[in-house]
């Protein structure tokens, strides 16, 4: 039997309060202070070895009432309404396969399964793999006309069991899994022409995906993009591999930096139903509208509306202008026709379009109207209803909060995630709005479990009859299944009760989510507070920063990470702050750093920390800052500001000069590095220009030598500037590690090294 105070501590472990937290009363009761609490802390080893594992429930919808879920290596088919299941594929199938299966994919008609193995990672999303097709009716692998090894991407058709795949940068289609492949494109060339897959910059910054293939709803057509990197400059770096390699390999990637030549883009649609073994496919090109074709441009969204209507969104290189082009198929000519009357322009006068790109449209079933998230007159992202043949739209949501995403659209309701509830930007809840009366809005998640759950995502069945709610915090993750007819909970899928039980025997930190005022505006922060936090004591503080455009660090998500260790074992407060430039609070805040990266977002981190140091429980002689990527840049700019607020800091894989970073990301916020545009802001925002001020702080600079994203060049130039300025600093590189420094040994090493540096800075050794 649990003692009452232990029960409450267990609740604290799963529900770090996401309100203004003072010292929880439970921690002040008899027998519950640091001197008498014999429970263990959450250690660095716990984080590195993932001792305490959160459970997830990753289902895959295969109809409007059924989903697949992998359990004990069996693939089970569940009925959503009743919860009963049957074995869809036995674990013995995997055991007999002879390869280590990385993933699987079931054809829409459930006749075949695609097994993925020999997975080889390339960049953030891209990889190559081998594939075999399993016939579910015959319960055997298909051995004829197999998919080639090192396939770059593969996808089932929307219906039936056709396959489209990319190999050696060209597209192939199989009408039947055991039929010969038909080649769709013939122009593919490594690192030059990409058909059906993205090049580096489109993968990283535009589509956040490797695939550039889109099946039509009934699989009559296959749309694809072609990227031409012929003129794109190459980034080159050494890859050292194992010590037996006498000369390092040289990795070369077409990588457009700010102001450099960009890839060009073409878009095609091919009629798959017209394919025959003796006739090569004819692809019809859809040319962008003239308003973007006149200069450099991007394809940023592809959405099939109906079987014979497709929506494309194009973006100018200066990303404050986008245009949606809705094209119809002309059966008489076999061409796709664009009409000015079906084009929709989106312009930003204060920054850039969308959060990172224009939002995707959600079309009604007849294809004659759509809903899309755009900025309203007040600068908040809300849902607007468009007719396809009219320019103006009607906003169906409003307020000083933002819609995060549209999740489902039926004939009666639109479902969306927003941060409206209680005015907390770092929360997420599911809402539905009645389409025949926009005043009828219901929050489906706000009051379900408000202490434990304030940050939700959702997964809908194919026609939105059922949905899975995924609660990510502030308590332990919780997965539940609901019927959309009445929105009642059908069952709990995973509640992490085992982890809850284990964490009751661990001294866990608590989480504070609150706001301060800067420049007359409310800005949010979070603090991970040590166990038995006592506001009358003084604690060292680590500011964990990202601070990139549209970022958010103060949120209601439960995490077990490095900060958990630092707070639990080392009694360090770990804080994060969302200042100017951060997202989900309106364009006024987000666009404040437009064309001036390295300014306000840096200043606000310093000023927020000054306010933290005045709260009475922060030791102002022991304040540090750390960040990764953009966070490494802001860390370095903060330390180089000479504010006197910070004693030390750690920058991992930082940007140091925006002219070194990729064109799509950088120019979105900074424009072009030319005298006619914004060269002065580029030159005034480098870390190197602040080298002299690093004499006042302790600095640890870390980078992976095979970082394809933020190149080692960035840290090399910081190092050179610091050496030239006579600054004593520490540095660590990780051989052949990319931007994530995620290999098992490197991951353990970097966090051990950073922990030692921080403890030394705070005199905790």
Curated annotation (Swiss-Prot):
Subunit structure as annotated in this protein's UniProt entry: Monomer. Homodimer. Heterodimer with Seprase (FAP). Requires homodimerization for optimal dipeptidyl peptidase activity and T-cell costimulation. Found in a membrane raft complex, at least composed of BCL10, CARD11, DPP4 and IKBKB. Associates with collagen. Interacts with PTPRC; the interaction is enhanced in an interleukin-12-dependent manner in activated lymphocytes. Interacts (via extracellular domain) with ADA; does not inhibit its dipeptidyl peptidase activity. Interacts with CAV1 (via the N-terminus); the interaction is direct.
Disulfide bridge positions per record: 384-393, 443-446, 453-471, 648-761
Side Extracellular, residues: 30-765
Gene3D superfamilies with a match to the protein in the record: alpha/beta hydrolase, Dipeptidylpeptidase IV, N-terminal domain
UniProt EC number: 3.4.14.5
Protein name according to UniProt: Dipeptidyl peptidase 4
Keywords: Aminopeptidase, Cell adhesion, Cell junction, Cell membrane, Cell projection, Disulfide bond, Glycoprotein, Hydrolase, Membrane, Protease, Receptor, Secreted, Serine protease, Signal-anchor, Transmembrane, Transmembrane helix
Chief localisation class: membrane
Origin species: Bos taurus (Bovine)
Residues with glycosylation annotation: 84, 91, 149, 218, 228, 271, 280, 320, 392, 495, 684
Family that this chain belongs to: Belongs to the peptidase S9B family. DPPIV subfamily.
Reactions accelerated catalytically: Release of an N-terminal dipeptide, Xaa-Yaa-|-Zaa-, from a polypeptide, preferentially when Yaa is Pro, provided Zaa is neither Pro nor hydroxyproline
A GO MF term: aminopeptidase activity
Gene name per UniProt: DPP4
Summary of the function given for this chain in its UniProt record: Cell surface glycoprotein receptor involved in the costimulatory signal essential for T-cell receptor (TCR)-mediated T-cell activation. Acts as a positive regulator of T-cell coactivation, by binding at least ADA, CAV1, IGF2R, and PTPRC. Its binding to CAV1 and CARD11 induces T-cell proliferation and NF-kappa-B activation in a T-cell receptor/CD3-dependent manner. Its interaction with ADA also regulates lymphocyte-epithelial cell adhesion.
Localization (cell): Cell membrane; Apical cell membrane; Cell projection, Invadopodium membrane; Cell projection, Lamellipodium membrane
Membrane-crossing residue ranges in chain numbering: 7-29
Pfam annotation, one family: Peptidase_S9
Lineage, uppermost ranks: Eukaryota, Metazoa, Chordata, Craniata, Vertebrata
Membrane topology: Single-pass type II membrane protein
One Gene Ontology term, aspect cellular component: lamellipodium membrane
Ranges in the topological domain labelled Cytoplasmic: 1-6
Record-level GO BP terms: cell adhesion; endothelial cell migration; negative regulation of extracellular matrix disassembly; positive regulation of cell population proliferation; proteolysis; T cell costimulation
Domain of life according to the entry: Eukaryota
Tissue specificity as recorded in UniProt: Intestinal epithelium, dendritic cells and several immune system tissues.
Enzyme class at the top of the EC tree: hydrolase
Active site: 629, 707, 739
